Amino acid sequence: RFKKIRRLGALPGLTSKRPRSGSDLKNQLRSGKRSQYRIRLEEKQKLRFHYGLTERQLLKYVHIAGKAKGSTGQVLLQLLEMRLDNILFRLGMASTIPGARQLVNHRHILVNGRIVDIPSYRCKPRDIITTKDKERSKVLIQNYIASSPHEELPNHLTIDPLQYKGLVNQIIDSKWVGLKIN
């Protein structure tokens, strides 16, 4: 993971750890003129590694975004940000996106009162995201919320930390995307 972070820059969803600062010297020696191909490839890889997507999943999202009205890049980021695993990460219910994927896969998360075990589930406005009533699920989420640094919550989400409940208010604005994409 650190190799990816050193090569591509900050990927907040991949891991909460940070590489040592002395490793940037190698990158400065290697950096020369970056071709258009390299720039595009790095931006694509940033998206893949940050959101934990396979090549095929990313291609499907690009295809959907291309058919939609508006800027393809903005629509693509909106689609990726409205995934259930990413919303759990943004709410602070998981420290990383892979951690959020694990919570969803292990059936700890309910959307509108129903168990959802698909991390790529596309959330819609007015979806209510809660934890299962089991004690183990609540303890897991409580630990994540307590240990995570309290960052500013995006406008499109609200959280009730006492009831372990999150609400999707609207589709995300482009300024709230936590990843810098060229």
From Swiss-Prot:
Gene3D superfamilies given in the database record: Ribosomal Protein S4 Delta 41, Chain A, domain 1, RNA-binding S4 domain
This protein's record includes keyword Zinc-finger: no
Pfam short name (any one): S4
Main localization, broad class: plastid
GO cellular component, one term: small ribosomal subunit
NCBIfam families named among the record's database cross-references: PRK05327.1, rpsD_bact
UniProt function note: One of the primary rRNA binding proteins, it binds directly to 16S rRNA where it nucleates assembly of the body of the 30S subunit.
Name the UniProt record assigns to this protein: Small ribosomal subunit protein uS4c
Organism: Neomarica sp. (strain Lejeune 1997)
